[in-house]
C-alpha cells in the first residue's frame, strides 16, 4: 500500500524508472552532468523514492545523470550518433558533420566534459522537432547489438520486475 491506501497488495514486483532532471545551475543554464557525477534532482518523484522502495513489491530506479536518452548517449555515444545521423533529414549539413566527429571518437573519451558535450548534442537533436523521441527509439531498436551498454539503473529495474533482485 502506498501513501496510506488500504486494501491488499498485488503480489507482483513492479519497477518504476524516472529521470533525475537536474534542472538548472546558478547561472540558469540547463545541467548536463558528466558521467559518474552526483547531481541533485529536481524531479519531485525522486523525493518519495524511499517511500516507494519501502513496499515489498515496488522499487523506483532513478537515472544517475539526467534522462533516459541522455544517459544512453553518455554510455553509447557512437551508436546513438550513428543512428541519429541515419535518420537526420539533411545528411550533408552541419548536424551530420558534428555527428561524424562523435562517431570518429569510437566511444574513447579521456575528457569527461567532452563526453558530456557530445551526449548533450545527441540528446538535443533526439528531442528536436526534426526527429523526436519516438522515431529515434524505433531507429535505435533496429541497431542495438550485444555490446550496447545498458546503464545499471535500467538493468536493475528490469531485473527487479522479473523477480525482486538487482545487480
Model-predicted regions and their roles:
Residues 1-167:
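Acidic, divalent-metal-binding catalytic cores of TOPRIM
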